């Protein structure tokens, strides 16, 4: 039985953590969690079309959240998270630490600029950040006491970050990876969320979707997908992180969140779409038009699904079609973003991927450049390169200087050709 709370103009009265209190009337479109008086577990969220109190009753202290990473996507997610921790103090500690790889910007350290001017002038300029978002250049201090870690760094730096964190993160901590890519090593090809789980001994999910950081930062409406497995050591409703808590942490009126449990599916789609986007950038730079870009996306989607089913059979095909992290993210990434920009620049100038990144990305990287190499290494080990002609074609263009105009013949499916009269 749900308990309906009385609505009084300007002041909403409710019980929070067992104490009767009054709070200002909240903004519309927030989520309300009611605890059924006759059940111990927390009920599912009820979306209100009108103003409502966003209430989750915890039987523990509010969760402390730390974001690891401060690039344009890292800062954008930190902005989203800090807005939600401030709006939901009964669930989250208001302060959000954001670990920053500190840099000198015209004589002032980047962390100081973020904490005084509340803008990341290098990676997310002209976007105001919440004052409860605190930049911290010390990785270990930033995660001290954290209950939820949000990883959002270029994935090639993850092993170094994990090495520094090892032994400093408690087993009860939960994590979400916003990284795109794979870890290829002695254990084969691993999801980055799995790598974090195994190396740090904490449960880690993933966030991915059709999310170009500048658009999310400007609060233009978009969707995303969060995937998280409830771990075996789950402490129960009101005591631990679950799908409801994660939705409350990431959902904003301009950033709609779907929470599922297919971590593998959204991670694979999020990593491999960057490789496909390089292919789209090549044909754009060559001036081949929309038909060619559509062909690249068609082949790319097929190879993404095949890769998932072949190497991560726990992933679900419907995730690629139904979730923002699937085909929607593929379309968005192939329409713009770093990978397309870098590949287009390569096609127009003849410059390498490395030089193009340096010229265009202000110290950041196009993740597809690294991912296509990781995928090539794994497929070579498995002797399955021929099963993924687009992924291999992108690798050869980037790393072996194969001419881009050969792209169609490299991905052509010869077995499907029917020659008249034969």
Curated annotation (Swiss-Prot):
<dbReference type="InterPro" id="IPR006109">
    <property type="entry name" value="G3P_DH_NAD-dep_C"/>
</dbReference>
<feature type="active site" description="Proton acceptor">
    <location>
        <position position="273"/>
    </location>
</feature>
<feature type="binding site">
    <location>
        <position position="180"/>
    </location>
    <ligand>
        <name>NAD(+)</name>
    </ligand>
</feature>
<dbReference type="InterPro" id="IPR013328">
    <property type="entry name" value="6PGD_dom2"/>
</dbReference>
<comment type="similarity">
    <text>Belongs to the NAD-dependent glycerol-3-phosphate dehydrogenase family.</text>
</comment>
<feature type="binding site">
    <location>
        <position position="367"/>
    </location>
    <ligand>
        <name>NAD(+)</name>
    </ligand>
</feature>
<dbReference type="Pfam" id="PF01210">
    <property type="entry name" value="NAD_Gly3P_dh_N"/>
</dbReference>
<feature type="binding site">
    <location>
        <position position="180"/>
    </location>
    <ligand>
        <name>substrate</name>
    </ligand>
</feature>
<dbReference type="InterPro" id="IPR008927">
    <property type="entry name" value="6-PGluconate_DH-like_C_sf"/>
</dbReference>
<feature type="binding site">
    <location>
        <position position="213"/>
    </location>
    <ligand>
        <name>NAD(+)</name>
    </ligand>
</feature>
<keyword id="KW-0520">NAD</keyword>
<dbReference type="Pfam" id="PF07479">
    <property type="entry name" value="NAD_Gly3P_dh_C"/>
</dbReference>
<dbReference type="GO" id="GO:0046168">
    <property type="term" value="P:glycerol-3-phosphate catabolic process"/>
</dbReference>
<dbReference type="GO" id="GO:0042803">
    <property type="term" value="F:protein homodimerization activity"/>
</dbReference>
<dbReference type="InterPro" id="IPR036291">
    <property type="entry name" value="NAD(P)-bd_dom_sf"/>
</dbReference>
<dbReference type="InterPro" id="IPR017751">
    <property type="entry name" value="G3P_DH_NAD-dep_euk"/>
</dbReference>
<dbReference type="GO" id="GO:0062040">
    <property type="term" value="C:fungal biofilm matrix"/>
</dbReference>
<protein>
    <recommendedName>
        <fullName>Glycerol-3-phosphate dehydrogenase [NAD(+)] 2</fullName>
        <ecNumber>1.1.1.8</ecNumber>
    </recommendedName>
</protein>
<dbReference type="GO" id="GO:0141152">
    <property type="term" value="F:glycerol-3-phosphate dehydrogenase (NAD+) activity"/>
</dbReference>
<dbReference type="InterPro" id="IPR006168">
    <property type="entry name" value="G3P_DH_NAD-dep"/>
</dbReference>
<feature type="binding site">
    <location>
        <begin position="69"/>
        <end position="74"/>
    </location>
    <ligand>
        <name>NAD(+)</name>
    </ligand>
</feature>
<dbReference type="GO" id="GO:0005634">
    <property type="term" value="C:nucleus"/>
</dbReference>
<dbReference type="InterPro" id="IPR011128">
    <property type="entry name" value="G3P_DH_NAD-dep_N"/>
</dbReference>
<dbReference type="GO" id="GO:0051287">
    <property type="term" value="F:NAD binding"/>
</dbReference>
<dbReference type="GO" id="GO:0005829">
    <property type="term" value="C:cytosol"/>
</dbReference>
<feature type="binding site">
    <location>
        <position position="157"/>
    </location>
    <ligand>
        <name>NAD(+)</name>
    </ligand>
</feature>
<dbReference type="GO" id="GO:0005975">
    <property type="term" value="P:carbohydrate metabolic process"/>
</dbReference>
<feature type="binding site">
    <location>
        <position position="338"/>
    </location>
    <ligand>
        <name>NAD(+)</name>
    </ligand>
</feature>
<keyword id="KW-0560">Oxidoreductase</keyword>
<feature type="binding site">
    <location>
        <begin position="338"/>
        <end position="339"/>
    </location>
    <ligand>
        <name>substrate</name>
    </ligand>
</feature>
């Amino acid at each position: 039985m749900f308990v309906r709370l009385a609505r009084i103009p300007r002041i909403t009265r409710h019980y929070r953590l067992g104490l009767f209190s009054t709070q200002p009337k909240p903004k519309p479109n927030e989520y309300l969690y009611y605890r059924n008086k006759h059940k111990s577990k927390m009920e599912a969220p009820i979306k209100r079309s009108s103003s409502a109190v966003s209430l989750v009753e915890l039987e523990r202290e509010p969760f402390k959240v730390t974001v690891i990473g401060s690039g344009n996507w890292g800062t954008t997610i930190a902005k989203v998270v800090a807005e939600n921790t401030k709006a939901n103090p009964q669930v989250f500690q208001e302060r959000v630490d954001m670990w920053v790889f500190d840099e000198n910007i015209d004589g002032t350290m980047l962390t100081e600029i973020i904490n005084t001017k509340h803008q990341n002038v290098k990676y997310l300029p002209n976007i105001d950040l919440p004052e409860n978002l605190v930049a911290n250049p010390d990785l270990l201090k930033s995660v001290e006491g954290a209950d939820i870690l949000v990883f959002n760094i270029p994935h090639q730096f993850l092993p170094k970050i994990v090495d520094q964190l090892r032994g400093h993160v408690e087993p009860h901590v939960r994590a979400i990876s916003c990284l795109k890519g794979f870890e290829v090593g002695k254990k084969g090809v691993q999801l980055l969320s799995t790598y974090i789980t195994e190396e740090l001994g904490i449960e880690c999910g993933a966030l991915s979707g059709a999310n170009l950081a500048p658009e999310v930062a400007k609060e233009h409406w978009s969707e995303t997908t969060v995937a998280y497995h409830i771990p075996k050591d789950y402490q129960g409703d009101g005591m631990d992180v679950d799908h409801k808590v994660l939705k409350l942490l990431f959902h904003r009126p301009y950033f709609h969140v779907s929470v599922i449990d297919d971590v593998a599916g959204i991670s694979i789609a999020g990593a491999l779409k960057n490789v496909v986007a390089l292919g789209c950038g090549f044909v754009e730079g060559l001036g081949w038009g929309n038909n060619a870009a559509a062909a690249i996306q068609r082949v790319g989607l097929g190879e993404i699904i095949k890769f998932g089913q072949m190497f991560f059979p726990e992933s679900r095909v419907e995730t690629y079609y139904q979730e923002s992290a699937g085909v929607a993210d593929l379309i968005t990434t192939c329409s713009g973003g770093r990978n397309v920009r870098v590949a287009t620049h390569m096609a127009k100038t003849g410059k390498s991927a490395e030089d193009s990144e340096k010229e265009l990305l202000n110290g950041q990287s196009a993740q597809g450049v690294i991912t296509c190499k990781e995928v090539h290494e794994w497929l070579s080990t498995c002797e399955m390169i021929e099963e993924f002609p687009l992924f291999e074609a992108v690798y050869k263009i980037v790393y072996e200087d194969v001419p881009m105009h050969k792209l169609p013949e490299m991905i052509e499916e010869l077995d499907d050709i029917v020659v008249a009269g034969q």
